[in-house]
Amino acid sequence: MKRIYVISDATGETAERVIRAALSQFYYDEVRVVRLCQIHNENDVQQAMSVAIAEPGMIAYTLVDPSLSQKVAQLAEDHGMYAVDLLGGLIYSLSCFLGATSQAKPGLLHRIDTDYFKRMEAVNFTVTHDDGQDTQYLHKADLVLVGASRSSKTPLSMYLAHKGYKVANVPLIIGIDPPVELFQIEQEKVVGLVIDPKRLVEIRTSRLINMRQSPRGNYADYQRVEDEITSCRRLYRQHPQWMVIDMTNKSVEEAASEILRKMAVREKRITEARVKGDIS
């Protein structure tokens, strides 16, 4: 059984993924990847290398401190072990290309990796909770968007998901009660979308034409659309804790920015109230 030692100043998870991706190119199963992590000084390097030297193998390291990288390389050479710097060459090349000095902060690679997987998890959640699907899991959402059909619920949900927020959206339809779960979750999570009826008629008409369907019917009828928006506004007034966003002539990016800004203000207010002891 051959061993590959991953020496990292963070968790080593990203480096291990790189190693395993490279290993997948070989028909060789008898390899064990051993992580030696949180290496922050020469004493840590010495201890990690002692483990590797006891059962020699290949060294793969990601250390942003050049002196520690050099120490690992020297010890590996002294004991006849292969060693590869997974990060140093790239950082040096980027430094030359950008004309800038690296931050040399341990763990940034892992943080970026973690952020990526958080976004992917949010996107997956949002896709599976689009248009009123699986409402029994609304409590797991960071935000729940509600509104009439074609009020930008889905594109806004996906935009926020790519920023790492788990978003569900629920359509509001005249004559059909919203799912009971909507009123059982934390109400500050709910965002009600409104839009000018004339603008919504234009959007729905365009949608029908693109689908080669007749725009004549209730879906794009002005009175019907106006009734839908009136019904939405009535529901929002009954739930003052809900945030309300007007989507009329507003881009998805602008709406998302407004939501996140209001969320930040709300969180700050709640935090200040807790500090003062006004709420538990």
UniProtKB/Swiss-Prot annotation:
Superkingdom per UniProt = Bacteria
Keyword Nucleotide-binding belongs to the record: yes
Where ADP binds, per the record, is at G147, A148, S149, R150, S151, S152, K153, T154
Q: What is its EC number?
A: 2.7.11.32, 2.7.4.27
Which catalytic reaction applies to this protein? N(tele)-phospho-L-histidyl/L-threonyl-[pyruvate, phosphate dikinase] + ADP = N(tele)-phospho-L-histidyl/O-phospho-L-threonyl-[pyruvate, phosphate dikinase] + AMP + H(+); N(tele)-phospho-L-histidyl/O-phospho-L-threonyl-[pyruvate, phosphate dikinase] + phosphate + H(+) = N(tele)-phospho-L-histidyl/L-threonyl-[pyruvate, phosphate dikinase] + diphosphate
Q: Which residues form a coiled coil?
A: none
Q: Which UniProt keywords apply?
A: Kinase, Nucleotide-binding, Serine/threonine-protein kinase, Transferase
In its UniProt record, a GO molecular function of this protein is: ADP binding
Q: What is the main EC category here? A: transferase
One Pfam annotation reads: Kinase-PPPase
| HAMAP family in the record | PDRP
Q: Which family does it belong to?
A: Belongs to the pyruvate, phosphate/water dikinase regulatory protein family. PDRP subfamily.
What is its biological role? Bifunctional serine/threonine kinase and phosphorylase involved in the regulation of the pyruvate, phosphate dikinase (PPDK) by catalyzing its phosphorylation/dephosphorylation.
How is this protein named in the record? Putative pyruvate, phosphate dikinase regulatory protein
